[in-house]
Each structure stands twice: as structure tokens, then as C-alpha cells.
């Protein structure tokens, strides 16, 4: 359908070209001053903070005050990057999350030209190529496949996909009696290992179904509410109803009443509630191949951190929710959850060489380890997450065989984690026809600036050509995508979201993505995790406190000994502690925290700094970690921090870590998470759950977790002096008024209770699985056309790139 005249007029009024034209006529001097400074930088790319710096340098403060909230300022504030190829400056402008416009200004002639995504990317490629590449370039465009598919248009709808989907498809599918047949067929198809559930062959039409439901409702109304299913199952079978309606008369009556309401007057919330009550998810497979995946003694190993903790906490909550639902549905079925990871025969004292390992705190959840293989046999040693690509296709086939043996059935849901796990999950779900969920944890493209444009520079070490392609394939294949925060999908008003950065990008010489993903797609859902409440609980709960660990903790923090577990000795042991715990890599920015602390003598007077990262006991296999390790020592020496800092090796005992957070609460300290980008921020959740006031990066998930100034504070890792001044202000105020510390601590605890618990997470995940599974069955939501396109991208592009990644050589150290 074409645009109306009104829509065209509206579009013209709001076009970026016209907005710049108006700014040019109203603020010619200012615009020329700013753009001339940009051009004077020479050929290159400027990030938002650099554009702001040039704006501040070009326009005096008094003039900037007059320009506040004008279209001119909005234009520059909305610019996410500037591509400078004199005399041209091209801007990528983001008026709001998920909405982009592109424009090019000729600074010499003051000409303005609006650009399509394609033309903007072509212009940008000149930075890498030196000139426009006239050869045919592969363009990836997923837009046409979704053109007829519904999508919301408001930024506030991003991440609430299931609500939008239910509203749209309910009205589309249930507009008359005939259109209800897909629901009937869906219920009739329900079975588990040959056992019929919900409906049997007696129900052949909607009329028969409604009649049976009314008779069942009448029968149940004469029974006590707690009558078990076994006492009315014969009557149900006569009516055509099988197991799955409920474990007692009251619950079965509620389910039947819900379905009758749906058949009479369908509405989205009733549909979601009904789908949440019927048995749909009984077997789950979770993919997380890379790193050292185990329950103990692995945290801090290369590529092993928050994702492992997330999944172990996730499966405990999921199993509890599955067991509860299965019981309430009146089924005698044992659910199974398999966490599939890579087997590491060179396990280094961990259980990573063990094929099957039961997850503690569960009854029916296991870690299933499947090795990587080559023609020479099993690959024994750890391989960096950046080098796993050549193994994954064969690995998927092996995994399919192993899970078939373990489950004796197809899984009902496959969840991928991170790029490698998501690709394997995608291939597996495609093969088995199973509902596929993606959890990114972190998309590397946002962590390494310009890693798409200059991918060739990164290729030897990071192999981003494979990774970014795998990410595109997985996110477009997924039935639904879970993120922990809105930030992951679409950032905020100032920063671009992880998924949003995949909407349009270019990898010169490889391919150009003109439409990679749509952040308004209803497959996106925000489901925030929590911390394990048995380990992480408030410091005020004295009866639960693990005081027996305090001697060990004091040794860790304060002993005068330097060894493989801790370096440097604190001089004044009574001062509050700034505490931080993360992997030692560039993005986590632990060295940035040390530098921030080192540059502020007043902060050193007020508090000690304790960092937990790396391993003093062994040389890292990871190149990036080696660089950061050396940098840390250099900074401690440069700022003469001995006596003010304690550097502790990575701690793998989560129980003790929980008490360590609480011990630092006792000392009225604070937790700082200084990452350049953090997808979610599990340590932020852990610290806040223990009651520790938290300062965390403004880039990524923590900015959403923390309400600034209420439940913690946002810091900018690119502005060390401002961040350290904020910490000085906090601890200074706490010295004058100790209740201020309590206020922020309580604010953090309240925030966690409202939004970040595993119980809320597991309830939502199970409901989403049911809803998307249903819509996949009854509609074209499986997006067959898209999947054919993805097959071509995988077969013709990804496989060739993966073949160029060198295989690990046994006996050598991977990543060296």
C-alpha cells in the first residue's frame, strides 16, 4: 500500500535534510564553525563524545546556552558518528532509539544531501578502502522478509514483543469461528512420547470441543475444589479430554473456563494466560560451548565468567518453574534440562572433562559435555571463543546425537548463549524444527569500536567476519530473543543498543548490511535475571551471615603476605573499601578503575581500593589478559599505590564471594563496575542484592538497573576525573552523614526486589516459550522465507569464512 499525501507531507516536514537546511539558514555561522572543525580533523570518523567536544570548542559557552533545545543542537546531539572525507561530512543521526537518518553536508558549498542507508554505507567504506569500491558487493537485507509482518512503531514498545504479537495475531486469527481451528489443531497435536494430552480423537470440531468443555465444567462444579484429577479422569476421557487440564477440580475448572472465554470472545491477555497453563515445555536444551563450563573452580578462567553463573542460576529457577507447572497441570512427567557445553579433556583440575554432571540444587538438570572433533580426533585443550568457528557445524551434529540419547525425545525449547552457542542452537533448532530462543549476553561488535569497518585489522586475532555473520544468522533465525535490559536492544537516548548496532553496518570487501535486524521486531523481549538469593542476600540478615568465613576474608583483604592469591598490602585497614570484581580484559576496564583511583589523591585518603581479577598464580593464555596484567602493574607503580590497593586473584568460591560483598558492606564501602560496555551487569545485581552501594558504567545494562542517585550511581568510564569526583563526593558525604550510605544501600535493595529476581525471570521465560511456540505452530511466524535466505548466507558465506580460521594445534597454547 502506498503512502497517503498526508504521510508524504509529514515525512517532508520532518526530513533530516530540511532540518539541517533550517539550521543552516538560522545558524549559518555556528554550523560552519562546527563543520569546519570537523573537516579540519581530516579524513576519519568521529564518535559522539568527539563531536560534542568539537561543538564545545567551536561555540562559546554563552552561545551554546542560546542554542539549547534548538533543532541545531538536537541535530548534533543526535549524531552517533560523523564520517569526514573533506569537503564532505556525513552524519548518522538517531532522533530516537531504533530510528536512523543519514545526511551529507558539503562544507565548502554548504550543500545538504539526504542519504539512503546504502549510500551512507558506501560513503563510509571510503575510510577503509580509500575510494569507492565499484565491484559488486554482497548486500544483506532482511527487511523485505518482514515487510508484511506487524511491528510496533513506538520506542517504548521495544522489548515487549509478546504483548504486541498477542494483540495483533489474536485479532487476525480469531476474528470468526472458522479462524479458531488452528487453536483446536494445536491442542489435538499435544502429546509427549506417545502419550496424548489435552484432547483425544473424540474432539473433531469446535462445536464438539465447546460442548465437551461445558459438560466438563458442569461435572467439576459438583466436586470439592481439591478433588484430584485421578477421580474425574475417566469422565474427562469420555468427553474427549486428556491429562493436562489441571491436577485438581479447581485448577482444571479454571483452565476450562479460560478456554471457553477464549472461544467466546478472544483477547490477548486470556490467550497468554491460557497458554501459560497448558503443558508445552518439558525438555529444554541450553547451548554454551566456549570456555570452562562447570560448577566450581572455573570462574576467572579464560572466557569464563558471568555467563556460566547466569546459566546455572537460570536452570535452577527454570526447573522449579517447570516442576510447579507440570504438577499443576496434573501430569506425571519428569522434565529434563540439558546444558550442552564443550568437553575439555585437558580440564586443569575442573570437571570439564566429565561427560555428564548433575547440577547442584536440581533434580533433573545436567551439564552434557560434547567434545570438538577434527579428522585427527578429539580436541583436548581450551580454545578461545574467537577461534571456535571451524568446529561448530560438526559439533552440532554430535550434539544432536547426544541429546537424542539423553532425552529420548526432541527438546521443546532450545536456548543459545553468546555467538557460538546461538549459532549451534540455530542449526539445531533448524534441523529439529524446535522453538529457538537467543540470549546474546554480549555482542562483540559493540565492544570493539569500528570492528566492522576495520574488520580486516581485527581478523587474525578475533575472526569477526565469522562472529558477526553468526550473530546475524542467529538473531534472524530465532523465534524469540531474550535480553536482560532495554539497553541491550536499543540503548538509550544517547547510546546505541547492541542489537541496534546490527541494523545497518558494513564490512568492506566482505558484505554490506543495509537491514540486519529490526529492534522493533516483536521477537524481542526483556526478561531480567537476578542473583542466587541463597548466596547473595542483604548484609542486614545477620542470622544467615557466614561469619565463619570472616577469618578467610580478612586474610584475603588485609594480610601482610603477598603471594599467588594477593599482591600489595593495605596500610590503613580501617578505611572503607572500593571493591570491584571482573575478568581482566580491555572492555571490563579494571585497569581504568586503578588509573581513576591513582589520579585522585583525595579518593586515596578516603578509601582503599580492592580489585579481584586475573590470576597471579599462572601466566594467562589470553593475549588481551596478558596486556592488561602488565598494564595493571605499571599503573600501580606509576601512581605509587602500594599501601592503598589490594590486587586479589580471581575468586571462584561464589559462597565466599557473597559474604565478601557483605563484609565490605560492614565496612561501609562501595562496589564499582567500570566497564566500557556491560551488556547486563550480574556483579552489579549481586552487589546490590547484598546491600552494597554500587557505582556502575553508564554504557549498557547497569544504566538501566540503577536509578541514578536513588539505588546507586552511573559513572562514565571515559571520564575518569568525573567518576572519581563522584566517589569522593559520596564517601565525603557518608563521613558527614552516615545515614546517606544506608539510604543508597536500601535504594539498591528495593530496586532488586521490584525487578531483578530469578522467580520472575523463570515465570516469564516459560510463558514466552509457550506463546511463541503456539504462534509458530498456528501462523507463518516461523518465517520460512527468512530461513531460506539464512541457509544461503550460512552455506555460501559463513562456511567459507569459518574454513579460514586456523584449527588449534595440540601442544601449542591457543590464543598465543
Swiss-Prot record:
Q: Which SUPFAM superfamilies match?
A: UDP-Glycosyltransferase/glycogen phosphorylase (SSF53756)
Ranges for region GT-B glycosyltransferase: 280-757
One Pfam family named in its UniProt record = SUS_N
Tissue-wise expression: Abundant in developing endosperm, low in aleurone, and undetected in coleoptiles and roots. Also detected in crude extracts of anthers and in immature embryos.
* InterPro entries listed in its UniProt record: Glyco_trans_1, Sucrose_synth_GT-B1, Sucrose_synthase_pln/cyn, SUS_EPBD, SUS_N
Gene Ontology molecular function: sucrose synthase activity
> Any idea which UniProt keywords this protein has?
Glycosyltransferase, Transferase
Please give the start and end residues of each transmembrane region.
Answer: none
Q: Name one GO biological process term.
A: sucrose metabolic process
Domain of life per record:
Eukaryota
- Reaction it catalyzes: an NDP-alpha-D-glucose + D-fructose = a ribonucleoside 5'-diphosphate + sucrose + H(+)
Family according to the record: Belongs to the glycosyltransferase 1 family. Plant sucrose synthase subfamily.
What role does it play? Sucrose-cleaving enzyme that provides UDP-glucose and fructose for various metabolic pathways.
What is the protein name for this chain? Answer: Sucrose synthase 2
Q: Which organism is it from?
A: Hordeum vulgare
Q: Name the gene.
A: SS2
Amino acid at each position: 500500500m502506498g503512502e497517503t499525501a498526508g504521510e508524504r507531507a509529514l515525512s517532508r516536514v520532518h526530513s533530516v535534510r530540511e532540518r539541517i537546511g533550517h539550521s543552516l539558514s538560522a545558524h549559518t555561522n555556528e554550523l560552519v564553525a562546527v563543520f569546519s572543525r570537523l573537516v579540519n580533523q581530516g579524513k576519519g570518523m568521529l564518535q559522539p563524545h568527539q563531536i560534542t567536544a568539537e561543538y564545545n570548542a567551536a561555540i562559546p559557552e554563552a552561545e551554546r546556552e542560546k542554542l539549547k533545545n534548538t533543532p541545531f543542537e538536537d541535530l548534533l546531539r543526535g549524531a552517533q558518528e560523523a564520517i569526514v572525507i573533506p569537503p564532505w561530512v556525513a552524519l548518522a543521526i538517531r532522533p530516537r532509539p531504533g530510528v536512523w537518518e543519514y545526511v551529507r553536508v558539503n562544507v565548502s558549498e554548504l550543500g545538504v544531501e539526504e542519504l539512503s542507508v546504502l549510500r551512507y554505507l558506501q560513503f563510509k567504506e571510503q575510510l577503509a578502502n580509500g575510494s569507492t569500491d565499484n565491484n559488486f558487493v554482497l548486500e544483506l537485507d532482511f527487511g523485505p522478509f518482514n515487510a508484511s509482518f506487524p511491528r510496533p512503531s513506538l520506542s517504548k514498545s521495544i522489548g515487549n514483543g509478546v504483548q504486541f504479537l498477542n494483540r495483533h495475531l489474536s485479532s487476525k486469527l480469531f476474528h470468526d469461528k472458522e479462524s479458531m481451528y488452528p487453536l483446536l489443531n494445536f491442542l489435538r497435536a499435544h502429546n509427549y512420547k506417545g502419550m496424548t494430552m489435552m484432547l483425544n480423537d473424540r474432539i473433531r470440531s469446535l462445536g464438539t470441543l465447546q460442548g465437551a468443555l461445558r459438560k466438563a465444567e458442569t461435572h467439576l462444579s459438583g466436586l470439592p475444589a481439591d478433588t484430584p484429577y485421578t477421580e474425574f479422569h475417566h469422565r474427562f476421557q469420555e468427553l474427549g479430554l486428556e491429562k493436562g487440564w489441571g491436577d485438581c477440580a479447581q485448577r482444571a475448572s479454571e483452565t476450562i473456563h479460560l478456554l471457553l472465554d477464549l472461544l467466546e470472545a478472544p483477547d490477548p491477555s486470556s490467550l497468554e494466560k491460557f497458554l501459560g497453563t497448558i503443558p508445552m515445555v518439558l525438555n529444554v536444551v541450553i547451548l554454551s560451548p566456549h570456555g570452562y563450563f562447570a560448577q566450581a573452580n572455573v570462574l576467572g578462567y579464560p572466557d569464563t565468567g558471568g555467563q556460566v553463573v547466569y546459566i546455572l542460576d537460570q536452570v535452577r529457577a527454570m526447573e522449579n518453574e517447570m516442576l510447579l507447572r507440570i504438577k499443576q497441570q496434573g501430569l506425571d512427567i519428569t522434565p529434563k534440562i540439558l546444558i550442552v557445553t564443550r568437553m575439555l579433556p585437558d580440564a586443569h583440575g575442573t570437571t570439564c572433562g566429565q561427560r555428564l554432571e548433575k547440577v547442584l540444587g536440581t533434580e533433573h538438570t545436567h551439564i552434557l559435555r560434547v567434545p570438538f572433533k577434527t579428522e585427527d580426533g578429539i580436541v583436548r585443550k581450551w580454545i578461545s571463543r574467537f577461534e571456535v568457528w571451524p568446529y561448530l557445524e560438526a559439533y552440532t551434529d554430535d550434539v544432536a546425537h547426544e541429546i537424542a540419547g539423553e532425552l529420548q525425545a526432541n527438546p521443546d525449547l532450545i536456548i543459545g548463549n553468546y555467538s557460538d552457542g546461538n549459532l549451534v542452537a540455530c542449526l539445531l533448532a533448524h534441523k529439529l524444527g524446535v522453538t529457538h530462543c537467543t540470549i546474546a549476553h554480549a555482542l562483540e561488535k559493540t565492544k570493539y569500536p569500528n570492528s566492522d569497518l576495520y574488520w580486516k585489522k581485527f581478523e587474525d586475532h578475533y575472526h569477526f567476519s565469522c562472529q558477526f555473520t553468526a550473530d546475524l544468522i542467529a538473531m534472524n533465525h530465532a523465534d524469540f530473543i531474550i535480553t536482560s535490559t532495554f539497553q541491550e536492544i536499543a540503548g538509550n537516548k544517547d547510546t546505541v543498543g547492541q542489537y541496534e548496532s546490527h541494523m545497518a553496518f558494513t564490512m568492506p570487501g566482505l558484505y554490506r548490511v543495509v537491514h540486519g535486524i529490526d529492534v522493533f521486531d516483536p521477537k524481542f523481549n526483556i526478561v531480567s535475571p537476578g542473583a542466587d538469593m541463597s548466596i547473595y542476600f542483604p548484609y542486614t540478615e545477620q542470622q544467615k551471615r557466614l561469619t565463619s568465613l570472616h577469618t578467610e576474608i580478612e586474610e584475603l583483604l588485609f594480610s601482610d603476605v603477598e603471594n599467588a592469591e594477593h599482591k600489595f598490602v593495605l596500610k590503613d585497614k580501617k578505611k572503607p573499601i572500593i571493591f570491584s570484581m571482573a575478568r581482566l580484559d580491555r572492555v571490563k576496564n579494571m585497569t581504568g578503575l586503578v588509573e581513576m583511583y591513582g589520579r585522585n589523591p583525595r579518593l586515596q585518603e578516603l578509601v582503599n581500593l580492592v580489585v579481584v581479577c586475573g590470576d597471579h598464580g599462572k601466566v594467562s593464555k589470553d593475549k588481551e589478559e596478558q596486556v592488561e596484567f602488565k598494564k595493571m602493574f605499571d599503573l600501580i607503580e606509576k601512581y605509587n599505590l602500594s599501601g592503598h590497593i589490594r590486587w586479589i586473584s580471581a575468586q571462584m568460591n561464589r559462597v565466599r564471594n557473597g559474604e565478601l560483598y557483605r563484609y565490605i558492606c560492614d565496612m561501609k564501602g562501595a562496589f564499582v563496575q567500570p566497564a566500557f560496555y556491560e551488556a547486563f551487569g550480574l556483579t552489579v545485581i549481586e552487589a546490590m542484592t547484598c546491600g552494597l552501594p554500587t557505582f556502575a558504567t553508564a554504557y549498557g545494562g547497569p544504566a538501566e538497573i540503577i536509578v541514578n542517585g536513588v539505588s546507586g550511581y552511573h559513572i562514565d568510564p571515559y571520564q575518569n576525573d568525573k567518576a572519581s569526583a563522584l566517589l569522593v563526593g559520596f564517601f565525603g558525604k557518608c563521613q558527614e552523614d552516615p545515614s546517606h550510605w544506608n539510604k543508597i544501600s536500601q535504594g539498591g535493595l528495593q530496586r532488586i526486589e521490584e525487578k531483578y529476581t530469578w522467580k520472575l525471570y523463570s515465570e516469564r521465560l516459560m510463558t514466552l516459550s509457550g506463546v511463541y511456540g503456539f504462534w509458530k505452530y498456528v501462523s507463518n511466524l516461523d518465517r520460512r522465507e527468512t530461513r531460506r535466505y539464512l541457509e544461503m548466507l550460512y552455506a555460501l558465506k559463513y562456511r567459507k569464512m569459518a574454513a579460514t580460521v586456523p584449527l588449534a594445534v595440540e601442544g601449542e597454547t591457543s590464543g598465543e
